[in-house]
Amino acid sequence: MDALFIPQDHPARTMQDTFYLSSPESIKIDEERLMQWAGTHQDGRGTTSRGWGGVFDAKESERALLRTHTTVNTVKHIANNPAVPSRVFGVGRVFRQETIDRTHLPEFHQIEGIIHEEQASLPMLITTLRTFYSKMGYSDVRVRPAYFPYTEPSIEVEVLWKGAWLELGGAGIFRPEVTQPLGTEWPVCAWGMGLERLAMLILGLDDIRELYQPDLAILSKMPIL
């Protein structure tokens, strides 16, 4: 989370929102990377940002947890390929302390994508997202301003579903506080969305929990995506 410029006191990092592990309780982080993130958080080190200020706690950084975003893979890829143009797409399981309801699950799959190249831009990102959702069968797509600690500008993507707008994912351009410590000067278009929520819409379900219920009679009628 430090690599994504999420403040160490952000609500998303509390026990109420994240599954922390008891074994192992901590994971060793590369000292050089840790110092870069510490400087960025404290005073924006090398960027135009002033950072978050305050004290940076290395022990907080090393706390082991179940990933809340597949963006951890994105960060690793950019760090390993800072000067290589790339377009990366992936699907992975994530875990969050969510209250279970018709559109939320504590364990689900996230779709993640990035465009990492010198000419990457917000119009390119929006066009990519509109194309993606239109190929999924959603012609009514809208983009709204949003806020995420790790992107600026930030947007949310919504599709029209049963007469109402349903938020499917967040996106934006990674902030310099994220990209510069990873060694790249190029902009990075990034987006993520929930696979189960998208599947719910495609299958015409009213409740996301139906995707995991054990009724064989219902499951036998579901198409294989």
Which functions belong to the PLM regions below?
Residues 1-225:
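TRNA-recognition modules of translation machinery and tRNA-sensing kinases, especially anticodon-binding
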